[in-house]
């Protein structure tokens, strides 16, 4: 998501086409829309959804190697789901960030989705905002829960500790995608509901 201010009116469809013609093949602008003058792509957002994709096969699918984290281990999805419930809500996520500067570390996780299909996991994280490396550390922590290194019941203690050393490893960046930014409460509520109904 991005925002810009233009002095002259534009044809949105033409602008979209021209913009995409200038971008590399792996980046696409999907929509162009006029907004109010005070709109800001980051500050006007009420929530974001990140997805993290993990390949659990012994040998990773060759076409997924750039876009998924290869983690060839059996995982206990029920334990991961239990741990995710402890993470949902408003918490100080100091234990789950590599942030070095003093900054407000309280965030709200509205929903965590865990979907297993065809030897792959898709984790969906919907929150009001995320700290530096937060989704990667949360993902690594859930994988540590899934392999038995961390018990689901330890998550509240890890949150209380406010100590990065207590949480799991940071999953690599290559499985992480910003999948959606929400600008209305209705959109956000619908996405949260979809995850909870899975």
Walk through the language-model features, giving the residues of each.
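Structured-RNA-binding interfaces characteristic of tRNA pseudouridine synthases
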Residues: 1-198
């Amino acid at each position: 998501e991005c925002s810009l201010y233009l002095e002259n009116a534009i044809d949105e469809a033409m602008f979209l086409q021209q913009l995409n013609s200038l971008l590399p093949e792996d980046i696409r602008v999907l929509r162009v829309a006029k907004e109010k003058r005070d709109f800001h792509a980051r500050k006007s957002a009420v929530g974001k959804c990140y997805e993290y994709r993990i390949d659990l096969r012994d040998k990773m699918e060759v076409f997924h190697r750039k876009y998924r984290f290869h983690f060839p281990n059996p995982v206990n999805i029920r334990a991961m789901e239990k741990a995710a419930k402890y993470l949902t809500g408003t918490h100080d996520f100091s234990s789950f960030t590599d942030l070095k500067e003093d900054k407000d570390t309280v965030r709200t996780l509205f929903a965590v989705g865990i979907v297993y299909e065809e030897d792959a996991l898709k984790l969906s994280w919907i929150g009001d905002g995320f700290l530096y490396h937060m989704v990667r550390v949360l993902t690594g922590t859930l994988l540590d829960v899934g392999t038995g290194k961390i018990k689901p019941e330890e998550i509240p203690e890890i949150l209380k500790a406010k100590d990065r050393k207590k949480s799991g490893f940071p999953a690599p960046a290559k499985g992480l995608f910003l999948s959606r930014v929400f600008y209305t409460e209705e959109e956000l509520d619908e996405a949260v509901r979809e995850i909870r109904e899975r």
